[in-house]
C-alpha cells in the first residue's frame, strides 16, 4: 500500500504503519475511517508524492503547525462550524446519532429505518439512564444490548427499562418430578437477591492447605459430612436473611441448589461478569465474597427485584429480571436498560451493536463536553480553507494575529526554503482533508466527480468559509447573526443543510435545525492521532531505507 516495491511482509514502513494505526484505532472512539483514510493519504504523499523530497523533520514540523492551527480554530467559541448540543432538542441529539450511523454503510440501514426505529431506540435508552450518567460520568453507560434472533428486520427491536435480560435457560433444579408448577416456576415476584462472585465450596480452603503443604488426608467420610453440613448452614443463613434468589458468578454446588429449592429459594449460577455487574446495579445487592455469610452480612446486603421470569424475544427465550422504581430505596440500585435488537443474523446484530454502543458512548461524552461540529464533510472543507489561507501567509511571512510565526523572522535563502516546504506540507494536509470529504461521493466516483462535489460544498458554505479565514480578527463572527452550514448527502448526491443556527446578543449559538453532527472532541482526537501516526512513520522512514 505504501511502497511500490514492498509487500506487507517485508516493508518496515508498511508494517510500522499497520501497527501504529491498529494501536491508535483501539484508543479512538468513532472516527476510525477518518483516521485510517487521512493518515494513509498523508503517508502516501510523504513516501511517493508531493512531500517525498522534503526533509522529514520539516514535514513533521509543518504537520504539527497545521494541527495547532486546526485545533485553535475548532476550540475558538466563534468557530462557525461549532455549536453546543441542546439536550432539550431531539433534533440535535438525533443529528449526533445520525452522524455516527451515516458513516456505517455496512449496517445496511436505510433512511426510513434509521429515522423511525434506530434513532428513537437509542434516544429512549439513553434518556432512561441519563440521570445515572450525569452522576457517574466516569462509569460505563448501563445500557445492555441483546440479540433477539428470528426476525428479518430491526423494526421489532424493543427497549426494556429497568430490566436485565439473561441469555440463559430457566433452571429446573428443585422442581419435583411430574410437577409442572412450583414456587420456583416463573414468574417469581418480590425477589430478595443474594449475589456472589465466588464458588460456594466449604472444602476449598482445606484442599488449598493440603496442596500447599504437599499432604493429603484421607478422610472422605468426615469431609463429606462436614461439606454437606456447611452447605446446609449456608442455605439456612440465606433463608434467615430473607433471600429468595441466589445468583452467582461462580459455581453453586448442586447439593446447595437442591437444599435452597426446598426452602423456595431460586438459584442461578455461572453468570458472566457483565451479567453480575448489571444485576448488582439493577437490584442494589452487595456482592458477597465469603461463603460463610457471617454476622457482618445483614439483610440490607440483599438486593431487590420486582420480578424474575422468562421472556420470549424472536424465537428465543431469555430470563428477565425487572425492578420497579418503588421496589427498593437503595443508593446502590441504579437504572439498567436493555435494548433487544432483532436482526436476521449475528453479523447484522454485531454491526448494529457497534452503532448503538458507539452512539450511547458519544451521547454520554457530550454531557461534560457538549460541543459538536457540522458533519458530512462540512468541517473538513472549512479546515482545508483555513489551512490554505495560513499556508499562503507562511510562504510570505509576516505577523499572524495568533503569534504562530515569530516577528522578525530572518528570510534568508535557507529559512525561505524551509517556510516554502512547510507551506507545501500544510497545503498537502489541506488537500488530504478535502479528499476525505470527497470520499462521500462513493468509491466509484472519479476524481472529477469529487472535485465537482467539493466545489459545490464550498459554494454552499461561502459565507462561513469567509468567516473561517477572518476568524483571528476580533469581529470575525459577531458581524453575522445566523449561519447555514452544508455537507454532502451521498444518497441524493447533492449538498444538504447539516446545521443552522442563530447567534444571540451574548454570542450564544442556538441551533434551529440539525441534520448531521460530529462531536468536537472526537474530531480533535482524530486529527491529533493522524498527525502523531504520520509523524512517527516519518521518523521511521528517515532512518529506514526501503528498496
Tell me the role of every PLM-derived stretch.
Residues 1-24, 251, 255, 262-266, ...:
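Generic N-terminal targeting/processing segments that precede catalytic cores or assembly contacts
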Residues 4-8, 22-186, 190-195, 240-242, ...:
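Non-catalytic interaction/clamp surfaces of large macromolecular machines
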Residues 8-9, 338-340, 345-547:
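Extended, low-charge hydrophobic alpha-helical regions
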Residues 17, 21-28, 42-54, 63-82, ...:
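Structural signal for hydrophobic packing residues in well-ordered secondary-structure cores
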Residues 39-41, 54, 61-65, 198-201, ...:
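Short, ordered loop/turn segments at secondary-structure junctions
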Residues 192-270:
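Extracellular/luminal Protease-associated
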Residues 268-341, 345, 349:
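Conserved phosphate-handling catalytic cores of large alpha/beta enzymes
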Amino acid at each position: 500500500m505504501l511502497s511500490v516495491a514492498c509487500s506487507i511482509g517485508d516493508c518496515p514502513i508498511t508494517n510500522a504503519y499497520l501497527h501504529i494505526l491498529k494501536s491508535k484505532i483501539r484508543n479512538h472512539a468513532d472516527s476510525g475511517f477518518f483516521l485510517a483514510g487521512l493518515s494513509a493519504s498523508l503517508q502516501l504523499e510523504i513516501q511517493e508524492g508531493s512531500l517525498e523530497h522534503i526533509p522529514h523533520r520539516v514535514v513533521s514540523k509543518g504537520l504539527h503547525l497545521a494541527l495547532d492551527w486546526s485545533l485553535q480554530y475548532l476550540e475558538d467559541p466563534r468557530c462557525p462550524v461549532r455549536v453546543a448540543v441542546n439536550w432539550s432538542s431531539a433534533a440535535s441529539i438525533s443529528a449526533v446519532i445520525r452522524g455516527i450511523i451515516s458513516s456505517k454503510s455496512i449496517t445496511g440501514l436505510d433512511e426510513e429505518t434509521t429515522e423511525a426505529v434506530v434513532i428513537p431506540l437509542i434516544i429512549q435508552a439513553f434518556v432512561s439512564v441519563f440521570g445515572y450518567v450525569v452522576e457517574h460520568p466516569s462509569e460505563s453507560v448501563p445500557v445492555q444490548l441483546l440479540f433477539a434472533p428470528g426476525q428479518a428486520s430491526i423494526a421489532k427491536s424493543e427497549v426494556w427499562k429497568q430490566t436485565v435480560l439473561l441469555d440463559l435457560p430457566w433452571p429446573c433444579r428443585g422442581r419435583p418430578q411430574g410437577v409442572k408448577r412450583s414456587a420456583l416456576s416463573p414468574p417469581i415476584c418480590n425477589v430478595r437477591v443474594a449475589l456472589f462472585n465466588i464458588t460456594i465450596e466449604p472444602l476449598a480452603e482445606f484442599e488449598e492447605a493440603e496442596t500447599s503443604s504437599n499432604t493429603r488426608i484421607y478422610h472422605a467420610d468426615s469431609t463429606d459430612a462436614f461439606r454437606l453440613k456447611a452447605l446446609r448452614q449456608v442455605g439456612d443463613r440465606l433463608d434467615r436473611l430473607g433471600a429468595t434468589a441466589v445468583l452467582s458468578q461462580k459455581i453453586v454446588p448442586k447439593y446447595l441448589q437442591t437444599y435452597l429449592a426446598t426452602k423456595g429459594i431460586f438459584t442461578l449460577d455461572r453468570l458472566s461478569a457483565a451479567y453480575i455487574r448489571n444485576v448488582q446495579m439493577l437490584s442494589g445487592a452487595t456482592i458477597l465474597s465469603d461463603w460463610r455469610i457471617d454476622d457482618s452480612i445483614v439483610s440490607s446486603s440483599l438486593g431487590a427485584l420486582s420480578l424474575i421470569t422468562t421472556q420470549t424475544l424472536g424465537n428465543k427465550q431469555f430470563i428477565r429480571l425487572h425492578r420497579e422504581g418503588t421496589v427498593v430505596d437503595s443508593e446502590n440500585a441504579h437504572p439498567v436498560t436493555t435494548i433487544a435488537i432483532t436482526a436476521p443474523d449475528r453479523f447484522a446484530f454485531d454491526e448494529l451493536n457497534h452503532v448503538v454502543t458507539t452512539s450511547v458512548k458519544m451521547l454520554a461524552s457530550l454531557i461534560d463536553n457538549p460541543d459538536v461540529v457540522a458533519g458530512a464533510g462540512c468541517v473538513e472543507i472549512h479546515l482545508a480553507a483555513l489551512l490554505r489561507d495560513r499556508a499562503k501567509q507562511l510562504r510570505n511571512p509576516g505577523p499572524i494575529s495568533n503569534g504562530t510565526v515569530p516577528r522578525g523572522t530572518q528570510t534568508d535563502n535557507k529559512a525561505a526554503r524551509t517556510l516554502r516546504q512547510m507551506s507545501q506540507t500544510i497545503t498537502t494536509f489541506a488537500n488530504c482533508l478535502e479528499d476525505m470529504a470527497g470520499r462521500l461521493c462513493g468509491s466509484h466516483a472519479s476524481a472529477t466527480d469529487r472535485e465537482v462535489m467539493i466545489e459545490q460544498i464550498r459554494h454552499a458554505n461561502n459565507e462561513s468559509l469567509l468567516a473561517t479565514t477572518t476568524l483571528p480578527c476580533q469581529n470575525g463572527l459577531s458581524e453575522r447573526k445566523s449561519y447555514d452550514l452544508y455537507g454532502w448527502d451521498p444518497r441524493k448526491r447533492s449538498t444538504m443543510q447539516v446545521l443552522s443556527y442563530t447567534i444571540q446578543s451574548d454570542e450564544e449559538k442556538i441551533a434551529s435545525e440539525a441534520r448531521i453532527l460530529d462531536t468536537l472532541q472526537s474530531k480533535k482526537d482524530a486529527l491529533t492521532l493522524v498527525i502523531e501516526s504520520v509523524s512517527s512513520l516519518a521518523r521511521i522512514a528517515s532512518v529506514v531505507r526501503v528498496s
